[in-house]
Amino acid sequence: LYYGDTIMENQTKLFQEMIDRAEAAVRKEISTWPEGTWTAEASADSDGMDLTKPVTVRGTLTIKNGELFFDYSATDPETTGMLNVHDYMTRSTTCCFTFLFLGEELLRYHNEGSTKPIHITTKPGTLVDSSPDAKIAAGVALTGCLIGEVVMSLLSQAIPEKAIAPYSRQITVNTVTIGKPGVYVTFCPSAGAGAVYGNDGYQCCATGSTLGNIGKTNIEDEMLRFPWEYIKYEFVTDNEGAGKWRGAPGIHYQVENHSTGRCMHQTGSWDGFKTSANMDKFAETAHALDAAGVP
């Protein structure tokens, strides 16, 4: 194809029009929200290095003149563990979770313009704006969830008719078999997504930073490829918690290792997660992992 000047100019105008329309639509929606300031925080048990010290993401939201102002300056300093994230990760996660509150009508049309009314402040050297040499291997999956919880808490306080409860936190990142080598990323012995105003939570989604885009793979396929047997993998009964709309039920997860070596879950302090979300002014989300004795 030959792209002459006229065609390129027309394409540029078209793309700019798409960006401008997205910005205008987002500003129009935000302008219907009440103005004010709200605060929230979410914590992990530790950074995986100092097991006695929790790490916390703290955020403030101000809504004014059809714009959103998120400020994470009060977040804890970056850590020696692998839970740090860089500034661009925080910005991306904040925008993604904000889009959840902007309605289905705009769902397919978000682009650069959608981010223009969203202003994000971070403090260099903190958990959410770490230095270039900080460890970040688990940052997106783990601290990303904390950022998402803070955003959902802030916006749920501001516009309760659009409230979203937290996703469950992941129990295990991966399973390592020693003897017959293998690494298996489970993603989903997690309970699932929290309730949304007007709707029950959705079971068996992965952690919040995936926005539900990752789910459990087929159990039979897993048992063919890896040397362990699923004894139980089913929803837990009566575990959703009180509320007008239920959360996800949680998972009863039990696996038997059939390899010649030992098999271990990398979890607990390694991933730095509490097993339930802990958000100020927000209902907690519960997990169940029977094999690990997690209530």
Residue ranges with predicted function:
Residues 1-295:
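Glycine/proline-enriched, intrinsically flexible loops and inter-domain linkers
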